[in-house]
Amino acid sequence: ILWVQIPGLYIGYSLGTCGVVLRPFLARSKIDEEVHQRALQAFFSRDLHATKDRTGILVMASLLEHRAEILADTGINAKVPLDTWQGILNDMTGKIKSGDLTEGICTAVRECGEVLAKDFPGTHDNPNEISNKIIIED
């Protein structure tokens, strides 16, 4: 009987922790909170909050949950209205939903850059303190 129970337990556990299986059963608010928590974790674990003027920004797309998030540090939020990011998110998610992930992310990054250039122009005494590379995680 153990030879049936142990594999069954393993399969049940695996399915229960698999996002693809769980996603249809989770409330929208729970999915939003999970994505937001992962964005916060990425923001702080990559030290985006550690710039001199607190001007780090994270643009994140979570493909499994079909959600996106833009997090800006306090230096940016002091000058840029929060609803600015919602407009950019709407553009990005619209492109992603239509099947153009690359264009969605590129558009979001470009639009964020345009917003930031107004209040945070690049200068010689304000070097780029963090990497601008795109990071893809499973």
Q: Residue ranges of each PLM-predicted region?
A:
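Membrane-cytosol interface motif
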Residues: 25-45
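Divalent-metal-activated hydrolytic enzyme cores
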Residues: 19, 25-28, 32, 109, ...
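Transmembrane alpha-helices and immediately adjacent membrane-cytoplasm interface residues
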Residues: 1-26
